[in-house]
């Protein structure tokens, strides 16, 4: 059976039995605690846990999933993959254990011709929780399985829970026996290579208490409703039904594997390590295509980092098979063609996917070339010293300078039989992050643990009234202090406030949260932040300015009108700039991110080259033309399919429900799906002033603008600057560019003359320094403190000049200088000195130790530095001593 046949058989079977067929959710999960959708049940968690009432009693889906926890196993086992599809059937308080078992057995053992999967009953084994006699008896009664093919196992394998207090229950797993060629007899409890798990039935019926580990917890009682959550791995069933050895050889994955074999000239099946690499390529390319089709872009954090890691592991695998050139142009289309029938968005969006992928590959090929050289040197030096571990500072250098992710360094070290000093690397990373954040001040702090919100979300969604009003009367539904639900908060407390309705906008869609207050009889709360910690619930982080607030108190939410006005100007301005971008650059220049706050907007868009000043001006002029035209802004709520038919733009990476809000500016001039707040006519924006355009990675650009009052203020400042320049330079405004260009040219000419003079001055010092050489053993040492110097480069130039003029006898040159309060010692050796055993790197480190710093370099040229300028004389003495030892 082809993968599509298995998928269709599943959906048809359960659809015919009253299950609502639910399309796959995005790989980007709604759950803020998850980077990705990691299991088929993830989109149904709110229904299974009772936080949100289920809109159906039964459901079925084929859910696309991403898991990278076992990424090191990919390619090495028959069933580990980072992307997989999970067939699931779910019951929300409807049928339970016996019916779930009956459905599973019928679908598995019914012939393919009759709509089933055609498994022989003799090849199937099951496991149950050892205390779940109900499930054991159901299997015997329904399937006729003998006791020896129903194995009872413990909580660690056959009991489902989330890892924290909440829903739990026993589970029953179904296994396929691949036969004695794959392992020992004895069932799943004996050998999980021979016996492959294909389906897991979870009977969610109990409430578990606190505990640790997989099995150390208490069962508190029964759940109000009993639910069913099952999952069948589509790829696992496919490789069994297609008679191949592993999931990488199935019809949806094999085309990429075959293309990798063709590109590398290696034959699949001829060499184990090459086979592993081809399987890695096949898996990771498919995962990358699917992630990018759901809006994920390569980056250095979060989801984007996972995608980048998958793509870079692919490049590495191809290089290890001898392919140094770019290959994504061949591999990605192979995956697209294999997946587009099940997921048309892969094909529809492939132009964008391929551009991103090819740019990422080219960037990493350059990174790999430079970083590999550094790592090869480190490997050689480590082995030469008899070491087993690459230094943490080397790994940090690779990460910080060459963009090498630490996991790649770890892999390459392991390939050379070495490890990495991860503790030192992590320490350096922490120091870097601490420095980066030292001056950052933010009003945001972490929200409470997500579990505290479940009771509030169960009461219903927070209704946002801020589209129509700035003040809303409401009631305090809940208070959270220090991560715990409380009944009151007093002056000075920082708390989260949960309300049934609010006029305060929660940060989302690139728009910053509203500023404002929440007031009531006897209390005044300053709103610091507004967020959506879980879907449908708004939390207001506040400081109690005065009084005491309690649960049940009447309250009024008040939005800062000036703040909201500026935010709406910025958000509507973003839509205009986006539309103008696409008019000028074409439809490929779509938005990839945005940020709006009062008076400021930032728009990231897909583009791989800088915009010329003329293009920037054209975009700004078009956007301001729309402002002057006073276009009406109309918002409508409608089904998403209707919105797409109208041409409303859905932004990549955003997640939308069945019903969406469409924002029109001037009818079709700008039409986007958007839940943000907006002006009622474009003239209210006032002015858009583009103030910057820059790169955000290799495939994105960023355009920044001031909007409204801030834009006018910025123009006033520019006007004042121009007036000052015309006065200072005694030049009319229209002639300023030429006048400034002349001044800059004169400055460059003067700088060149100064540089020539300094070079001559350095040359004149060489004879004096050569005459000061003294013997240290078999080597002549020339050393001197130069006093104050402009930079370390000046010292380096002079050291190099002296070495070149020193002749062929063994010579070491060590010169020091004070570069703005930073002592520098630079050491150079000629070939004869190196033959005599003198190494510049060792000598520079000896000097640096005295200066209170560090140093190093190559045997022919090295540098040391520190913080103690007064110790320069001692540092030069240390060079002599090290040379003499």
Swiss-Prot record:
Cofactors required: Zn(2+)
Pfam families in the record: DHHA1, tRNA-synt_2c, tRNA_SAD
Record CDD domains: AlaRS_core
Annotated InterPro entries: aa-tRNA-synth_II/BPL/LPL, Ala-tRNA-lgiase_IIc, Ala-tRNA-ligase_IIc_anticod-bd, Ala-tRNA-synth_IIc_core, Ala-tRNA-synth_IIc_N, Ala-tRNA_ligase, Ala_tRNA_ligase_euk/bac, DHHA1_dom
Single GO cellular component term: cytosol
Keyword Mitochondrion (UniProt): no
Matches recorded under Gene3D superfamilies: 2.40.30.130, 3.10.310.40, 3.30.54.20, 6.10.250.550, Bira Bifunctional Protein, Domain 2, Threonyl-trna Synthetase, Chain A, domain 2
Catalytic activity: tRNA(Ala) + L-alanine + ATP = L-alanyl-tRNA(Ala) + AMP + diphosphate
GO molecular function: alanine-tRNA ligase activity; aminoacyl-tRNA deacylase activity; ATP binding; tRNA binding; zinc ion binding
Keyword Metal-binding tagged: yes
Note on cofactor: Binds 1 zinc ion per subunit.
Residues holding Zn(2+): 571, 575, 674, 678
GO biological process: alanyl-tRNA aminoacylation
Residues making up the signal peptide according to the UniProt record: none
Family: Belongs to the class-II aminoacyl-tRNA synthetase family.
Domain notes: Consists of three domains; the N-terminal catalytic domain, the editing domain and the C-terminal C-Ala domain. The editing domain removes incorrectly charged amino acids, while the C-Ala domain, along with tRNA(Ala), serves as a bridge to cooperatively bring together the editing and aminoacylation centers thus stimulating deacylation of misacylated tRNAs.
Function: Catalyzes the attachment of alanine to tRNA(Ala) in a two-step reaction: alanine is first activated by ATP to form Ala-AMP and then transferred to the acceptor end of tRNA(Ala). Also edits incorrectly charged Ser-tRNA(Ala) and Gly-tRNA(Ala) via its editing domain.
Protein's name according to its UniProt entry: Alanine--tRNA ligase
Organism, scientific name: Clavibacter sepedonicus
């Amino acid at each position: 059976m082809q993968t599509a046949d298995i998928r269709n058989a599943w959906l048809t079977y359960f659809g015919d039995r009253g299950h609502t067929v639910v399309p796959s959710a995005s790989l980007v999960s709604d759950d803020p605690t998850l980077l990705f959708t990691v299991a088929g049940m993830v989109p149904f968690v709110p229904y299974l846990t009772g936080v949100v009432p289920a809109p159906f009693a039964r459901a079925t889906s084929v859910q696309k999933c991403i898991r990278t926890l076992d990424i090191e196993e990919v390619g090495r086992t028959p069933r580990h993959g980072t992307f997989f599809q999970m067939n699931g059937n779910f019951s929300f308080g409807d049928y339970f254990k016996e019916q779930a078992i009956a459905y599973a057995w019928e679908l598995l053992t019914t012939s393919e011709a009759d709509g089933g999967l055609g498994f022989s009953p003799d090849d199937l084994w099951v496991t149950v929780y050892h205390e779940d006699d109900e499930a054991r008896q159901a299997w015997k009664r329904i399937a006729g399985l003998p006791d020896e093919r129903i194995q009872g196992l413990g909580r660690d394998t056959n009991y489902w829970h989330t890892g924290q207090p909440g829903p739990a229950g026993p589970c029953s797993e179904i296994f396929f026996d691949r036969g004695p060629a794959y392992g020992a007899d004895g069932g799943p409890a004996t050998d999980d290579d021979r016996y492959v798990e294909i389906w897991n039935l979870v009977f969610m019926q109990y409430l578990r208490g606190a505990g640790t580990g997989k099995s150390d917890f208490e069962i508190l009682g029964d759940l109000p409703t009993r639910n069913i959550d099952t999952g069948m791995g589509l790829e696992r069933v496919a490789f069994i039904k297609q008679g191949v050895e592993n999931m990488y050889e199935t019809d949806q994955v094999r085309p990429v594997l075959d293309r990798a074999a063709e590109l590398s000239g290696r034959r699949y099946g001829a060499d184990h390590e090459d086979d592993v690499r081809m399987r890695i390529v096949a898996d990771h390319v498919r995962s990358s295509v699917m992630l990018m089709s759901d809006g994920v872009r390569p980056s250095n954090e979060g989801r984007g980092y996972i995608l980048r890691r998958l793509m870079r592991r692919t490049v590495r695998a191809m290089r290890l098979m001898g392919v140094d050139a770019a290959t994504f142009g061949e591999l990605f289309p192979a995956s697209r063609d294999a997946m587009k029938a099940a997921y048309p968005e892969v094909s529809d969006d492939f132009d964008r996917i391929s551009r991103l992928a090819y740019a990422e590959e080219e960037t990493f090929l350059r990174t790999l070339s430079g970083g590999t050289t550094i790592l090869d040197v480190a490997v050689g030096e480590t082995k030469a010293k008899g070491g087993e571990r690459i230094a943490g500072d080397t790994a940090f250098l690779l990460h910080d300078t060459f963009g090498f992710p630490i996991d790649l360094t770890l892999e390459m070290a392991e390939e050379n039989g070495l490890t990495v000093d991860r503790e030192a690397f992590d320490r350096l990373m922490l120091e870097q992050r601490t420095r980066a954040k030292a001056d950052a001040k933010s009003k945001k702090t972490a929200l409470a643990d997500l579990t505290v919100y479940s009771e509030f979300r169960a009461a219903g969604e927070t209704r946002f009234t801020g589209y129509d009003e700035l003040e809303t009367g409401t009631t305090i539904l809940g208070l959270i202090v220090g991560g715990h639900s409380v009944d009151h908060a007093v002056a000075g407390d920082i708390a989260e406030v949960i309300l049934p309705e609010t006029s305060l906008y929660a940060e989302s869609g690139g728009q910053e949260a509203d500023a404002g207050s929440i007031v009531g009889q006897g209390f005044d709360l300053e709103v610091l932040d507004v967020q959506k910690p879980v879907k449908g619930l708004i939390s207001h982080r506040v400081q109690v300015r005065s009084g005491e607030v309690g649960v049940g108190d009447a309250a009024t939410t008040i939005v800062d009108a000036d703040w909201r006005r500026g935010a709406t100007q910025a958000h509507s301005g973003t839509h205009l700039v986006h539309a103008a971008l696409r008019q000028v650059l074409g439809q490929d220049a779509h938005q990839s991110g945005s940020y709006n706050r009062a008076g400021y907007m930032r728009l990231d868009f897909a583009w791989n080259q800088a915009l010329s000043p003329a293009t920037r001006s054209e975009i700004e002029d078009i956007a301001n033309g729309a402002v002057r035209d006073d276009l009406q802004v109309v918002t409508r709520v409608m089904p998403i399919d209707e919105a797409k038919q109208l041409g409303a733009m859905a932004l990549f990476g955003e997640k939308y429900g069945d019903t969406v809000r469409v924002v029109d500016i001037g009818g079709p001039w700008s039409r986007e799906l958007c839940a943000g707040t907006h002006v009622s006519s474009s003239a209210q924006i006032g002015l858009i002033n583009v103030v910057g355009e820059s790169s955000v990675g290799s495939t994105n650009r960023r355009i920044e603008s001031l909007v409204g009052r801030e834009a006018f203020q910025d123009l006033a400042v520019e006007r004042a600057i121009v007036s000052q320049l015309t006065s200072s330079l005694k030049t009319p405004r229209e002639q300023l560019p030429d006048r400034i260009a002349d001044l800059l040219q004169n400055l460059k000419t003067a700088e060149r003359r100064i540089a020539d003079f300094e070079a001559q001055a350095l040359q004149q010092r060489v004879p004096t320094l050569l005459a000061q050489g003294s013997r240290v053993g078999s080597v002549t040492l020339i050393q001197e403190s130069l006093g104050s110097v402009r930079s370390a480069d000046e010292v380096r130039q002079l050291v190099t000049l002296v070495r070149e003029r020193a002749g062929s006898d063994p010579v070491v040159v060590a010169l020091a200088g004070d570069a703005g309060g930073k002592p520098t010692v630079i050491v150079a050796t000629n070939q004869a000195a190196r033959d005599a055993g003198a190494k510049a790197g060792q000598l520079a480190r000896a000097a640096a130790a005295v200066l209170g710093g560090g140093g190093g370099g190559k045997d022919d040229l090295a540098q040391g530095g520190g913080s103690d300028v007064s110790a320069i004389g001692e540092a030069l003495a240390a060079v002599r001593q090290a040379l003499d030892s």
